């Protein structure tokens, strides 16, 4: 199940952590309750027992965690930010309460991972897709490798400092530090459902990585696989670039014969079959993708060459 908040880029840049957490949780909970209600309505209509097919995975978009995850650069030790710890581990009112109260699920979400020197200065930062099978201690981040110029780093910013001001004027927020590109092209094994010993190799794609075919194919293995793309297309506002992005991504399915699910903050959240066909997408009654909501889908996870 993919969750979309449809936040504008400017609002995304000045977001308050508590409000984002609450909005993600509320939207996820409402989506699960809607699935339950639909199953019950269908059972009543057909005169049969209700079959509740609840989501095994919940996917939140790129940079959904408004508070960065911090690590010690020299050791890789994670600093337990209390807000993030509570959000994932507290028994009441947060993710764990949702798991206990409605259904257990594995969370895949966008995070910003910051590595600090022993003196407390920022050494490097990564834009990640992170898997949480349980509480905060279960975090498994995968860092984005294909960074976007003027979106995740400013080329030659020391030589041309005016570029930073130009970026801030167009994006509505300061750039901050440049992201560091990740290096791993290994799929991330994720249980098909919580507690299962059977796994699917997730091909983790952040933002525009889903359009770079030469990069995506490095993750292909002869095993059950699924491409997961988390993105924030708020930069495009309501232009046709949102549609162009996901339609370009659909070619990765055709090329690699792998399904894909895209969770967009703003843009097109869609589930695609291995032939690029749309299994499900999130749109309002007018057909516009610029809406808040959830998208639930079941995808094939074959390992065709």
How should each PLM-predicted stretch be described?
Residues 1-305:
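Enzyme catalytic cores with a strong preference for nitrogen-chemistry domains
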């Amino acid at each position: 199940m993919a969750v979309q908040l449809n936040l504008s880029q400017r609002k995304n840049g000045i977001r308050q952590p508590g409000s984002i957490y609450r909005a993600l949780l509320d939207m996820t909970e409402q989506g699960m309750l809607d699935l339950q209600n639909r199953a019950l309505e269908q059972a009543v209509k057909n005169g049969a027992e209700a079959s509740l097919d609840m989501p095994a995975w919940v996917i939140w978009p790129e940079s959904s965690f408004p508070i960065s995850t911090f690590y010690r650069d020299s050791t890789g030790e994670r600093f337990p930010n209390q807000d993030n710890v509570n959000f994932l581990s507290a028994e009441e009112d947060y993710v764990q309460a949702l798991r206990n109260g409605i259904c257990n699920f594995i969370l895949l979400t966008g995070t910003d991972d910051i590595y600090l020197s022993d003196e407390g200065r920022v050494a490097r930062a990564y834009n990640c897709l992170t898997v949480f099978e349980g509480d905060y201690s279960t975090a498994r981040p995968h860092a984005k490798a294909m960074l976007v110029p003027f979106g995740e780093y400013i080329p030659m910013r020391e030589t041309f400092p005016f570029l930073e001001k130009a970026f801030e004027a167009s994006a509505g927020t300061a750039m901050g530090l440049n992201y560091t590109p990740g290096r791993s092209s290994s799929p991330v094994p994720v249980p098909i459902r919580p507690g299962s010993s059977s796994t699917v190799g997730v091909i983790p794609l952040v933002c525009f990585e889903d359009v770079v075919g030469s990069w995506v194919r490095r993750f292909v293995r002869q095993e059950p696989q699924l491409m997961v793309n988390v993105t924030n297309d708020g930069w495009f506002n309501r232009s046709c670039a949102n549609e162009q992005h996901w339609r370009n991504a659909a070619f990765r399915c055709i090329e690699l014969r792998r399904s894909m699910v895209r969770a967009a903050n703003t843009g097109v959240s869609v589930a695609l079959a291995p032939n690029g066909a749309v299994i499900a997408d999130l749109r309002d009654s007018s057909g516009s993708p610029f809406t808040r909501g959830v998208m639930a889908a079941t995808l094939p996870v074959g390992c065709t060459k």
